[in-house]
């Protein structure tokens, strides 16, 4: 639990004091990206004239969403100098998970707030986090539904509800669930997409999700849900250590 709070505090402090990125789940990062892949930066180019964007050639190792491309554009500076607080520079040879979206010029853009996960650089992220995220993306890439989680949902109760699973162990580190809502945000159905090894844990997680109150994350007055709106959610299990019991959370730490 201490590791969870430490990592969460770092994520939140980064979003508050640097680039205001916020914290996203893996499912939402996948859902709101045009292109998702495990890849490697093989060549960087000079910044485009008058823009804080530079081109980078990539080598795709695994493609999870979108079409194969040979390059992306990075929001930052290729000379690695300080620009804005959101500027980044990714050295050649860096292996990472790329989450990209298209800008108004139809360019695939990655940046500080894209949800990038570096795989061969020293970061405060654990090896287990990287492994979980790669496995999760492989699972999400197999979904029949491609246009998911268009409207983000939120529950202030979920963290406390998942705390009731503290001390319950699982051989698997994550589960994915599909929630179906009415236009009025009433939960109609819930299914296991890629569950935990133990069916008993899936049942308890689904019971928690069923008894949770959900609301729109933003634009509550202007956003209207479609009938039978499907929302996918990822839940993670962290095993016990010497001082703490195992626990479950919606964050991949």
Each PLM stretch: what is its role?
Residues 203-253:
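Short, positively biased Gly/Pro-containing turn/loop motifs at secondary-structure boundaries
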Residues 4-13:
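Sec-dependent N-terminal signal peptides
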Residues 171-197, 209:
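Short tight loops/turns at secondary-structure junctions
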Residues 163-165, 193-200:
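A short acidic/small-residue loop/turn micro-motif
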Residues 16-176, 226, 236-244, 249-253:
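Transition segments tied to proteolytic processing and entry into folded domains
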